[in-house]
Amino acid sequence: MHEFFLYYIKKKYVIMFKHLISFIKTVYQNYFEIASCLGAVFIILLAIFMDNYLGLEACPMCIMTRYAFGLIAFISFMGVLTNKLYRFNKLLIVLSSLSGIAVTGKQIYLQNLSPEEIANLSMGCGMPLSTQIEYFGLIGGISNAYQGGPTCAAENWRFIFNFAEWGFIFFITFLLLTGIKLIKGR
């Protein structure tokens, strides 16, 4: 009796897993742009929630990460509206993902420095990103913020990974899935 019960439960989980895989394939093949847009918007909303309700302050690199997610959301939404620019939209998502990987990768690098190395960093993350862009111009402000600083090296939140590591994982996922779509065509 006990073995039959275990067999029955195992069979149910296998069927449920097959349905889940089938659902993921359907979403990937038919609703990729909508899923990408919603996923990126969800990540941005989560970051805003963490700022406003958990009292965490976003450093300039975190803001640049949000902009990369925003680009992915916007380009994915435009992909839903315009089917004629399919390859161009996918290429823009790949470029946005690469920029997000660069920013989050640099932030992860900064977070893994020793305290002595962090103390020797420039103050690239000392001012808010908007202030840096106002003083140094768009390219200068982004370049200065990308250099990083002690503020960007701080880990304020962790759920298995910190926010930069989660962002890195999501950007890699966006890059791989979009790259496969770009190579295969539709």
Where are these regions (language model features)?
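Secretory/periplasmic and organellar redox-cofactor proteins
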Residues: 6-60, 69-72, 83-186
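Cys/His-coordinated zinc-binding microdomains
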Residues: 63
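Cys/His-rich microdomains that often coordinate metals
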Residues: 66
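Interfacial segments of multi-pass membrane proteins
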Residues: 79-80
